[in-house]
Curated annotation (Swiss-Prot):
Pfam families tied to this protein: NAD_kinase, NAD_kinase_C
Keywords associated with the record: ATP-binding, Cytoplasm, Kinase, NAD, NADP, Nucleotide-binding, Transferase
Residue numbers binding NAD(+): 73-74, 147-148, 158, 175, 177, 188-193, 247
Record organism: Escherichia coli (strain SMS-3-5 / SECEC)
Subcellular location: Cytoplasm
Keyword Nuclease: no
Name listed for the protein in its UniProt record: NAD kinase
InterPro entries on file: ATP-NAD_kinase_N, ATP-NAD_kinase_PpnK-typ_C, NAD/diacylglycerol_kinase_sf, NADK
EC number: 2.7.1.23
Stated role: Involved in the regulation of the intracellular balance of NAD and NADP, and is a key enzyme in the biosynthesis of NADP. Catalyzes specifically the phosphorylation on 2'-hydroxyl of the adenosine moiety of NAD to yield NADP.
Length: 292
């Protein structure tokens, strides 16, 4: 066993038998190689593992050197928002659909992971967004996002009127179905579907992408990631929401603003040694191949 990683966490929310099979294979393989392994509690319960060290996501973040997330991008997003708070590296085995964030092929995961455990990997720091719903002199409601923060109506679709301030300076007003505020990581997700630009992961930038704006002049805007975005609302409705990674919703009440900024911590995401971002784009998005 090498000294690059000593304690490995196994993470994920198994939804079908193939994912559970991968979890079990990974656990037994790591134990056989002599690593200390800590398994997320739900996985250990589903696999009926006995005499195994288990923990919550937060405990895995505190104790492990590396977390292996088995599942799709949704599993990775859910785990990464918690794990990003800790000094832990994260890699994913794809058991979902696209797999932009989960690089390892489940059929070749052992060999790829063996190389990673020997220290042969590519490391990236992916920043998160922090969203606050706040009113003057009131307690804030806060969440974070790896991909995007989305302003949208609650249960019934309708037009929203709002103003956007960047670093407390008025930028524009808009009537639309909402607004997507995306990180470079999220630029290939919901933002892409809404016509937003693709940003390479190392860019220190945030995109603001309108959702069905009621004007032909509204276009996506790219700003520095050090900027703070404030959303203000002109209506008296109280059915608006902010969604983080399409997994966490924060309701917006009358008189409240939304403040979005770059988070203080980041995700330590690692990839196999042969990883290429542009090859991932070509494969996942069906781009044409090289001509010569």
């Amino acid at each position: 066993m090498n000294n690059h990683f000593k304690c490995i966490g196994i993470v994920g929310h198994p939804r079908h038998p193939t994912a559970l099979t991968t979890h079990e294979m990974l656990y037994r393989w790591l134990c056989a190689k002599g690593y200390e392994v800590i398994v997320e509690q739900q996985i250990a319960h589903e696999l009926q593992l006995k005499n195994v060290k288990t923990g919550t996501l937060a405990e895995i973040g505190q104790l492990a050197d590396l977390a292996v997330v088995v599942g799709g991008d949704g599993n990775m997003l859910g785990a990464a928002r918690t794990l990003a708070r800790y000094d832990i590296k994260v890699i994913g085995i794809n058991r979902g659909n696209l797999g932009f964030l989960t690089d390892l092929d489940p059929d070749n995961a052992q060999q790829q992971l063996a190389d990673v455990l020997e220290g042969h990997y590519i490391s990236e720091k992916r920043f998160l967004l922090e969203a606050q719903v706040c009113q003057q002199d009131c307690q804030k409601r806060i969440s974070t996002a790896i991909n995007e923060v989305v302003l949208h109506p609650g249960k019934v679709a309708h037009m929203i009127e709002f103003e956007v301030y960047i670093d407390e300076i008025f930028a524009f007003s808009q009537r639309s179905d909402g607004l997507i505020i995306s990180t470079p990581t999220g630029s290939t997700a919901y933002s892409l579907s809404a016509g937003g630009p693709i940003l390479t992961p190392s860019l220190d930038a945030i995109t603001l992408v309108p959702m069905f704006p009621h004007t032909l002049s509204a276009r996506p805007l790219v700003i520095n990631s050090s900027s703070t975005i404030r959303l203000r609302f002109s209506h008296r409705r109280n059915d608006l929401e902010i969604s983080c990674d399409s997994q966490i919703a924060l309701p917006i009440q009358e008189g409240e603003d939304v403040l979005i900024r770059r988070c203080d911590y980041h995700l330590n995401l690692i990839h196999p040694k042969d990883y290429s971002y542009f090859n991932t784009l070509s494969t996942k998005l069906g781009w044409s191949k090289k001509l010569f």
